[in-house]
């Protein structure tokens, strides 16, 4: 018998990341890949990248010449379909990806662009422009550690699973184009009708946000100050001196937010009270009520930006940039562009692993150790809730040890996230809210103070 042996060569998988640095991280996680030009290649994988957006929707004039003129007569501009045009500065990168996609060696494609709507759009536009017909899968990264990358490769999402996100991304892009192009040209034409050219930009997000700022500014300008008086008194007791503030015990809430129990609207009324109680003895009574204060939920991007602005004066853009560096460069935080403040319900073991690393490597280690030692880290729906997460969960540490010294601002954001991650497992703080009411000549004065109550 004669046998013919045919060697079958397995195809390669092309992985497309959003930026070169992420492509490098993925290539190192896979292992065994060599740098070839601007991509990485091995026996089974080719890892390449975009540089952000490589394509954009065409300008109106490219659909119909007259639509390029900025006048009311040529509005609205509503194409029957949207076409793509390469972005000039990144055309070389697009051509490189086209070549890889058309390679006979490549038999499937993995989308490893950022795990969100914009990353999905970047990849989908590349697929549309290159007319790719090869099978597509999605690498959905929650963090950039080697372990997280390899785990994501074990749980690739199908093209069908990602279609709703792709549709949302394209719809958002086309809506921005329609509102931006038509709104900007209409407002510019209106403001330029008496001569000149007065560019007036309009945007789907920009313009409503501007309206919020304008409304607030109008309220500030129309604000009419009203003078009011308060009466404060110092009371001497054996233990020292305490201060009380006059209030009207018969006060009832009004629809006027300026009216409050402690406010007096005539100077003579305040003076009358001061004269009546000066140098007189009073009777004091106290009532205390226990209260608790729980840690707020884990951070999403918006709450992290607010906190960083409040504590450090960082702008929203600065905080995002720092968090992105801690995610991509340092691998210390999970994906930052999230709107979720909870974790998956099966994440308890992972949380304990992360806290164990934090306990050994962070300046906050003693607090992480206590949380683990005293069994604070337990399942609770406030923290672990699948209904409160979508494509991403809350921003938390990855459990990776810092491999380089963080900058001052990076350390601040990392510590902020780590503190919240530890604190959310601690039991609520316990307080006593005390009200001390002092009555002098039938006038009431109030002192409110809060003190921590000891735990059993």
Residue ranges and their predicted role:
Residues 3-181:
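Intrinsically disordered, low-complexity regulatory segments
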Residues 16-18, 50, 112-114, 234, ...:
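Generic beta-strand/beta-sheet core signal
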Residues 149-228:
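C-terminal or mid-to-C-terminal helical accessory/interaction module adjacent to the motor/catalytic core
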Residues 11-12, 110-115, 194-199, 288-297, ...:
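Conserved short loop/turn motifs at secondary-structure junctions
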Residues 46, 54-87, 99, 197-324, ...:
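Long, highly charged, low-complexity internal segments
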Residues 142-148, 301-302, 322-333, 337:
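Short, conserved phosphate-binding/catalytic loop or strand-edge motifs used
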Residues 166-169, 176-178, 329-415, 451:
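Extended, highly charged linker/hinge segments and catalytic-adjacent loops that couple domains
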Residues 452-456:
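A short, hydrophobic C-terminal helix/tail in secreted or cell-surface proteins
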């Amino acid at each position: 018998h004669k046998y013919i042996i045919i060697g079958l060569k397995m195809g390669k998988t092309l992985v497309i990341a959003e930026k070169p640095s992420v492509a490098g991280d993925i290539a190192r996680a896979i292992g065994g890949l060599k740098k070839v030009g601007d991509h990485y290649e091995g026996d089974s994988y080719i890892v390449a990248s975009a540089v952000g957006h490589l394509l954009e929707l065409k300008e109106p004039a490219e659909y119909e010449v007259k639509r390029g003129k900025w006048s009311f007569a040529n509005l609205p501009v509503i194409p029957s379909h949207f076409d793509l045009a390469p972005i000039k500065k990144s055309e070389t990168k697009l051509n490189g990806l086209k070549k890889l996609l058309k390679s006979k060696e490549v038999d499937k494609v993995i989308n490893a662009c950022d795990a969100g709507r914009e990353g999905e759009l970047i990849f989908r536009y590349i697929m549309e422009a290159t007319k790719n017909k090869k099978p597509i899968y999605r690498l959905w990264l929650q963090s950039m550690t080697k372990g997280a990358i390899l785990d994501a490769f074990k749980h690739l999402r199908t093209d069908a699973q990602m279609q709703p996100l792709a549709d949302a991304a394209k719809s958002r892009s086309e809506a921005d184009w329609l509102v931006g192009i038509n709104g900007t040209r209409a407002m510019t034409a209106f403001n330029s009708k008496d001569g000149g050219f007065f560019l007036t930009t309009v945007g789907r997000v920009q313009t409503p946000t501007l309206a919020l700022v304008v409304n607030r500014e109008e309220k500030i300008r129309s604000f009419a100050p009203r003078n009011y008086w308060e009466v404060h008194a110092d009371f001497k007791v054996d233990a020292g001196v305490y201060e009380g503030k006059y209030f009207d015990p018969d006060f009832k809430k009004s629809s006027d937010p300026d009216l409050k129990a402690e406010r007096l609207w005539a100077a003579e009324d305040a003076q009358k009270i001061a004269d009546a109680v000066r140098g007189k003895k009073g009777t004091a009574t106290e009532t205390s009520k226990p209260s608790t204060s729980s840690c707020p939920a884990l951070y999403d991007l918006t709450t992290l930006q607010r906190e960083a602005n409040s504590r450090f004066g960082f702008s929203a853009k600065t905080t995002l940039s720092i968090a992105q560096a801690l995610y991509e460069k340092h691998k210390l935080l999970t994906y930052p562009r999230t709107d979720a403040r909870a974790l998956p319900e099966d994440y308890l073991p992972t949380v304990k692993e992360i806290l164990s690393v934090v306990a050994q490597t962070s300046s906050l280690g003693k607090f992480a150790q206590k949380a683990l030692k005293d069994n604070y880290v337990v399942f609770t729906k406030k923290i672990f809730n699948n209904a409160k997460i979508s494509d991403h969960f809350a921003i938390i540490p990855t459990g990776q040890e810092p491999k380089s010294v963080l900058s001052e601002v990076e350390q601040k954001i990392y510590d902020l996230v780590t503190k919240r991650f530890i604190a959310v497992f601690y039991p609520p703080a316990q307080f006593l809210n005390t009200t001390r009411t002092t009555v002098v000549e039938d006038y009431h004065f109030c002192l409110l103070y809060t003190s921590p109550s000891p735990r059993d």
